[in-house]
């Protein structure tokens, strides 16, 4: 009997030291955004055709893919436009992987949206290898643009 009382007291004492901590999936307690891959980088109008403009500012040759197509090249200092048409949309709207040829460099994507023309400019640069790298531009069914 005495051991049950001691065990119960020890458990209650241990629980007193626990503090609630917000999980990663919870909204920020200060009402603002917390940076991370789960936050959209941009927003587009998903009721109109979307133009993705890829700008290669890495100093390296890149390759990118589109659903149902083979890899295409994006040479140093060039840009390519990818049209995402309404008829192409199923659950998610677009997933465009972009990598350096051979996957040898860490990349970073910066976004700029022209809401009048529904143009998303993706500026691709090199990033510090110690940071997480961007590998794909993803647009979901609500028009939110993410880097993964």
Please place each PLM-identified region on the residue numbering.
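Mature extracytoplasmic domains of secretory-pathway proteins
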Residues: 61-107
């Amino acid at each position: 009997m005495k051991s049950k009382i001691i065990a119960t007291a020890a458990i209650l004492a241990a629980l007193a030291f626990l503090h609630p901590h917000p999980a990663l999936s919870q909204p920020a307690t200060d009402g603002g955004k917390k940076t991370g891959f789960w936050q959209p980088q941009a927003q587009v109008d998903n009721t109109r055709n979307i133009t993705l403009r890829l700008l290669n500012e890495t100093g390296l040759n890149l390759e990118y893919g589109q659903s149902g197509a083979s890899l295409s090249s994006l040479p140093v200092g060039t840009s390519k436009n990818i049209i995402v048409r309404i008829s192409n949309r199923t659950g998610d709207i677009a997933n465009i992987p972009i990598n350096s040829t051979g996957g040898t460099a860490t990349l970073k994507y910066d976004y700029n949206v022209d809401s009048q023309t529904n143009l998303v400019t993706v500026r691709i640069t090199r990033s510090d290898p110690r940071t997480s790298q961007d590998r794909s531009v993803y647009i979901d069914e609500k028009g939110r643009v993410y880097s993964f």
